[in-house]
Design a protein with these regions (language model features):
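Active-site neighborhoods and metal-handling regions in enzymes and metal-associated proteins
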Residues: 1-85
Length: 85
């Protein structure tokens, strides 16, 4: 289950989500969620002033691709902030 929460405050939208495994979940699905989470946490850990933005994608790819998953390279995000998606 994916829970997506949006808040609007003082002219700005904020957005977050979390994935929960519910019931009997296939091992392949469990692995996908785990690798996704692991790559996200590794990418966040890397982020700091003066770090190269492009390296974030490399960090994610280096975790998910050896596990047989791929990264969507043309995704550009969505409108959030003053404009809601």
């Amino acid at each position: 289950m994916n829970l997506d929460v949006t808040a609007y405050y003082d002219g700005f939208h904020g957005d977050l989500n979390e994935t929960y495994l519910v019931g009997r979940v296939a091992e392949s699905s469990r692995d996908l969620v785990q690798k996704t989470y692991e790559s996200l946490m590794s990418a966040i850990e890397y982020c700091a002033p003066n770090k190269m933005y492009r390296e974030v994608g490399n960090i994610i790819s280096n975790i998910v691709e050896p596990a047989g998953y791929s990264v969507v390279r043309s995704y550009t995000g969505h409108g959030i902030g003053r404009i809601f998606h």
